[in-house]
């Protein structure tokens, strides 16, 4: 696998959303709120893996590590859904992300 970036993730999410649009309701600003709530839920699952398994198992136990990464993937999927709901392109996201990075570099 080569470069896996925001554009690739958004394309994957568009495919998934298109497949299930009748049941999930598609992507729109009105749906963003629900996607964000699902993202929070998935973040809680990431936290549960950390709390219940600990750092050492995440780093050294392949099953725990896989479970942790799967939950992080769920977070990223919902994150990308929110971007898509608000029609935020990879280029727009990258521009603002890099600007924010520069701000943070010069903050303290």
Residue ranges and their predicted role:
Residues 1-108:
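Flexible "arm" and connector segments at domain edges
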């Amino acid at each position: 696998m080569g470069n896996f970036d925001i554009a690739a993730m958004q394309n994957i999410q568009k495919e998934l959303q298109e497949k299930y649009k009748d049941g999930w309701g598609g992507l729109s600003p009105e749906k963003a709120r629900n996607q964000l709530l699902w993202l929070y839920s998935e973040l809680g699952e990431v936290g549960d893996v950390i709390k219940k398994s600990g750092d050492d198992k995440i780093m050294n136990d392949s099953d725990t590590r896989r479970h942790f990464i799967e939950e992080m993937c769920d977070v990223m999927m919902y994150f990308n859904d929110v971007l898509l709901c608000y029609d935020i392109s990879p280029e727009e996201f990258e521009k603002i992300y890099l600007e924010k990075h520069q701000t943070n570099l010069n903050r303290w």
